[in-house]
């Protein structure tokens, strides 16, 4: 994984609007950060500390503190378990962008997340691995379902158009439990894609549990995998808010 987008929330947590404001890349042996047009489109956004110019390119041989601080320190005793929760091997040294791409750099009640832009895998498929969102809001019955689930359990998606916080929300349920309760939600960055994929009549979506981490925090409790054929002409992360701000400052000044 060589690049991630940074999403920021404008407004309060319950009703805030999320959108991309920057892009983090690994280029050869250094890291690069640039702001995207979303940084000018989201009300209230201000530049991150240490990266004050929205039109600058920032490069570093080490991961920028804003993102490095969202990784669990290797010296922590729970670090090997932390790797396993995300599907990595305990003794491996995964790339920090790969870890952030799975954990999304999430912190409780935070206004910042990172996410990868989906790209076709080696088989030309749409394939994403991610932690289920919203588990902390699941009912007691849903929490019990999660505790009883095994790796490989099949999941299904249902649009939740009436969701008061996000009309694009995609709720997640266990496929083989009739009248089962909502377990959580797809990550925001996948919800719009999922609706597009579900609209493809010929597309078969395989959505399964990869790991259940009963010893992990709730936001890392359920690791999922979503896979389906890549639709013809499908190009995620192409809207204006994803485009780089670099090079637009002269046009704004004109």
Regions found by a protein language model. Give the residues of each.
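Conserved active-site motif detector
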Residues: 1-254
